Amino acid sequence: MDTNYNEIGIKAFQEKRYEDAAQAFTQAIEANPEEAVGYVNFGTLLAAMNDIERAERFFQKAIIVDETAATAYYGLANLYYEAERYTEAAKLYRKSLDHGIQGADAYYMLAKCFERGEQYKLALPYMQRAAEIAPKDIQIRLAYGILLCTLEMFEFAKPELEYVIEEDWNNADAHYNLGVLYAVSTTDTDKAKYHLKQAYTLQPEFDQAKYIYDMICQRDN
């Protein structure tokens, strides 16, 4: 029976036994040098250890070995995103999607790349798709709501932010954005103030929430 070095390495990685993981992934690569998965796993390990240059080389090697390795494109995209190389990261997230990567994360990260470049309309379909795939993911639903607010699509943003608050009452960002939504798109200043107050009560250093709350109060007087 063949030893599955990748499984051994992943288990060690999950248990934060990084040296054991590195040894196992090395053995996986030596056993199957023409398979991308060992290189991807080693790249992921190196990225977690903040050895970015070597991680990049392993992801690139995985792509050379198998140009359809979706997880290699995704791992390399994450490195570039963290390095604020958003245009390059976006291309790689697209490739990971083209090659069939599963789940919502690649759609979400591709949307974030476009957001970083202030290309909000380009971000929208990818963030929407992420929310459709992972409807219970609070981070994605909040990001989708904020993006809709940025595009002044308040009618669609409101239920997204309300969902986040229903699921995570202590989410100051959701309260803040819902408060701003009420302030700029409705005449319901009471709800605007309520959610803004919740935001800076939950997070006392949330100066922007307090500033807008005070501004509304002054306007009402």
Predicted regions and their residues:
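Structural signature of tandem alpha-helical TPR/SEL1-like repeats
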Residues: 14-27, 49-61, 83-95, 116-129, ...
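Position-specific recognition of the canonical hydrophobic site in helix A of tetratricopeptide repeat
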Residues: 6, 13, 40, 47, ...
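Terminal, low-structured helical/coil segments at or just beyond the last alpha-helical repeat
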Residues: 1-4, 8, 181-221
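Short, charge-rich amphipathic alpha-helical segments embedded
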Residues: 27-49
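Structural marker of alpha-solenoid helical repeat scaffolds
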Residues: 31, 65, 99-100, 133, ...
